Amino acid sequence: MTSRLFLTGIATSGRHGANPGEKDQAQDFVVDLDVEVEVGDDELSSTSDYRTLIRTARETVERDSFDLLESLAHAVANDVLAHDGVVKVSAIVHKPAAARSNEVQGIAAAATVER
């Protein structure tokens, strides 16, 4: 049996971007995850702990450095998928500063990976 976890608004920072200066200092990013997990029974030990998945998403954004937002979204999705019991992950990575500088409500990239 599987179930889906929706983890939204995971705020973090990282050094990502293709434009000059974007990697010079950390920028804000927000990650949303849709994670399909295996569920055995009503015990935490039988599924994926959402706190661990949130920590993984933050660590990926903070650790790695990519030119493309799309590449960052794939890295987050793949790192979350690596956890036991995770079957499928959709990760959306929002870059608020890019939205503001382009006078739009939001700029984000999404990636979906599965076993």
Predicted segments with their positions:
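N-terminal, polar/charged subdomain of small-to-medium soluble alpha/beta proteins
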Residues: 1-115
